[in-house]
Amino acid sequence: MAAKDLLNKGLLLHGIGAGVLKSVTNKIAEMTTSQSMKMDITATTEDVYGGDGLFPLYTYISKKEGNVEITNAEFKLSQVQIAQGTKITTGGKRNYRVLLTKASKNLIDGASLTGVETIAVIDPDGNDASKNVTVTETGGVTFGEGAAEGEYAVWFKATDANSVRAEMLKNAMPEVATFNWMFTTEDSEGNKYQIDIYARRVRADGELKIETERDKATAPSLKIKILDPGDGHDDFAVVTVTPLAA
């Protein structure tokens, strides 16, 4: 199909497709279960007036902005490392909550725990019981003489070799990345096309929201800003349309 035919080809924009962000240090966020992707290019114009005329003699663009917002159906740690300046480590600590009585000798019977850190010990009346309950680094429990009868709730952390930890650093900026998106669509006659969207340099806006709610699945979003392409390039964003074989 000739270029002039594609330029004037009307396409139905539906479906979501998939995308990937790759930072300058090779951090990757792949998005294959998104709910929506929106790219918004805006411009600020300035008018120049002269003489007695009421219409501007000239108008020019003083500023351009490009933004992409992606709403995902699933939460991924890779999204956190793109949205924030992060340090990723493995073998982090996992939170636990267990219920114990004065007869308990271990936080979890039969479990091998290491690196235990007590968060809170709550007595049967809902008060702090940390003075009456001792917890060891390997999960052993000892109740003092002053401990009352009843059920105790113990919150603690323990090392888990399978955990992955994303530390959000207070003075770190989100990394510059490239943005690629692709989806398949069709024209009114049913012919298939692929649309690719590319931005050479982008950076997340630093916003991160994690929300949980009973009986509801929430959709985390990622907002990124398109930057000047730099390095002598003029194309800050590119849209490519390709006809697909039947």
Predicted regions and their residues:
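Short N-terminal helix-initiation segments at or just after the protein's N-terminus
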Residues: A2-A18, T159-A172, A246
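Solvent-exposed edge beta-strands and adjacent loop segments
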Residues: A2-I82, N132, I195, A199-S221
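Beta-strand elements of well-folded, non-transmembrane domains
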Residues: I41, N72-K76, A158-D160, F183-E189, ...
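Short secondary-structure capping micro-motifs at structural edges
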Residues: L54-Y58, G139, N162-L169
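Beta-strand secondary-structure signal
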Residues: N67-T71, A153-W155, T178-N180, S221-K225
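Extended beta-strand solenoid/passenger and fiber regions
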Residues: K76-T134, A158-Y193
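Mixed-charge, glycine-accented linear interaction segment located at domain edges/termini
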Residues: V121-D125, V135-E137, F143-A147, Q194-A246
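Small/polar beta-strand repeat architecture
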Residues: E145-V164
